[in-house]
Amino acid sequence: MNLSFDQSADRGFLLWVLGACTVLSVALSAWCIYIDDVINNDGVEYIRAAERLALGDWTGALSLYKWPFYPLFMLIVGKVTGVGYQMAGHIANSVLLSAVVALFVLTVRALGGTSRRLTLLAALVALIHPAFNEYRAFIIRDPGYLVGYLAGVYFLFRYCRCARPRYYVGVLVGFAFASLFRIEGLVFLFCSPILIVLTRTQPVRSLGLLATFASIVGVLLATVLGWWALVPDGAVKFSILSDPVQIISTAWDQIASGINKKISILQQHFLGPFSARYSYLLFGLTVPMIIVSTTISQLTVPWFVLTVFGLRNDSGFANHIQARTWINLMLLHLMILATFVLIMLFLVDRYLLGFSVTALLLIPFVLDNVLGKLRWQDFNRLKQVLIVILLLWGVGESVSGLDNFTRHQHLKEAGLWLAGQTAISGSLVSNDRKVAYYAGRHADLENIVPSFGVLNNGLKKKRWPEAEYIAVVCNLDLCQKIIKHFKIVWKYDQIKVFSGHKAGKVLIYRLRR
């Protein structure tokens, strides 16, 4: 055992670690962008909104995206650096992700991980786990949310050890910053007084009253959060803030209607007429199954096992109040996730980023416990083999977050080729936002459709009289049917085909006037 790693990390050592983390984080972002230089679909939406904001068209920006702060941040970065909005998004996220890594290390230290070894382990987890690296090439708002969330959590854990007002202010500022990027930040912001009260070392006298108040706040926040997930972009008006009761009433009606529709689908398509009475039970079981499976997918199996191991053993946090606060944060995340699942009956992996990062705060202490405090000889041969397999598996999963080479290069190539042919507004129709973006026609919203079926129906109704080119993105199985359909029905042959590696094709057609 190297005793130098057991001693407390002084200021110089901490600054060296944070500096190295910043450099490595920027390098990882540059690498991920290099191997996946094709914009993501959400990125196209944010760029559209930023372009509207640049023109002072706030109404138009809100009609495109109902949470405009991230596009505004991209706009500011673009103006300051003088680069395009796509590059501005990459620069902003690279900086934000570097801040996330640094805040993760600082939060682990706030939990009691002040030794050199724990500081290095925290940096290692923050740099290699897929939750931090999988989305480095994406233009998304989640890094900004994680910065604010982790800042709030950092000050919350500092408050657990020393109840100073400045730490509470830090909690509010952090969660308020998080709410600029994702609405979940508002949930933590409004629940911060409850989280603070639960950090008290003395028993809370009115525990029943506090529990009732917390339940009411949780239900109201979950209702508004669910309504926000359901309401389409462009349907949000500034005037809604004047009638919060109407918001809650409308939200509850829409959520109840959505849940009833999903239960009806379960009754009609999954259960027979004699089993329809079990639809509510099936729906109730589906929710935790989706949360658990998505959690394992996001954390990955080896890291999930390490988290469970940490839950079963002493966390290693500085005190039990911090451990209790960590559990409260996890429960609050689960409430948010359950709300999403109840409404949508699915979860996107990156919805769990906040939950995953909170869970990963436990991992450095688990690794320190296994590698530092427990002797290798204490494990029998089977446990030694399992530990080695688990660690190697964890490293393999971490590497997988850094080898996401793009499979959509053909979309970019097709769009760039079309850019020279479709300079006039309305001249391109496509079923893919990325192709339209690289063609410079992403602002023609009416000409970008979600599927080939909608595109074909629009052609029948002559919906796009100014269109000169059609770009159809299809998978390998569907492409042959589409080619045959255009040949027989429309008498068109594709003039250009861009093929992707196991990712389908882009068929280019030129319309005859």
Model-derived features with residue positions:
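Short acidic/glycine- and proline-prone juxtamembrane loop motifs at membrane-interface regions
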Residues: 41, 66-67, 137-144, 348
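Signature aromatic-anchored transmembrane alpha helix within multi-pass, membrane-resident enzymes
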Residues: 18, 22, 117-120, 173, ...
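Short helix- or helix-capping micro-motifs
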Residues: 25, 121-130, 134, 154, ...
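Membrane-lumen/periplasm interface segments of specific transmembrane helices
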Residues: 28, 208-302
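Transmembrane alpha-helix segments characteristic
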Residues: 16-23, 120-122, 126, 170-173, ...
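Transmembrane-helix motifs of polytopic, lipid-linked glycan transferases
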Residues: 91-112, 147, 151
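Membrane-embedded, lumen/periplasm-facing catalytic core of multi-pass transferases
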Residues: 54, 108, 156, 386-437, ...
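Extracytoplasmic catalytic/substrate-binding loops of multi-pass membrane glycan-assembly enzymes
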Residues: 35-48, 61-76, 83-87, 234-241, ...
